[in-house]
Amino acid sequence: MRVKDFDHLVLNVRDVERSLEFYCGPLGLEPIRVEEWRAGEFPFPSVRVSPSMIIDLLGRPRSESNVDHICLVVEPLDWQQVIDSGTFTVLEGPVGRSGARGEAQSVYVRDPDGNTVELRWYPQDVVED
């Protein structure tokens, strides 16, 4: 498995609107899916850091960490082989999820310190033989 990019970071925030004001105001980041979130059509809004990186703002009371999980883009691969290898403690997946570049296939794993890491690949990255 090879990591290609950093896709997104999910922050647990107490007040989503206040966080949107901070990231879109003084930091000048582009809001994403805000109206869909306000209409109850999407579970959270995001802000775009770069064409391939976003920060998701997840409304939650503060827990032990303000970071819910990080997401790394990997080269397209067979998730079942990854799961069967026993290399990772798999928490969830494979599942289809939305990210910085659209829909992707993801597996959630736990790192040695208990942090959740989402590993994902995008269908558009598959190279046909």
Locations of regions flagged by a protein language model:
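Core segments of cupin and vicinal oxygen chelate
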Residues: 10-54
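Vicinal oxygen chelate
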Residues: 16, 70-116, 124-127
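Short acidic/glycine-enriched loop/turn segments that link adjacent beta-strands
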Residues: 38-43, 64-66, 100-105
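Conserved beta-strand in the GNAT
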Residues: 55-58, 108, 118
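Helix-adjacent hinge/juxtasegments
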Residues: 57-60, 64-68, 73
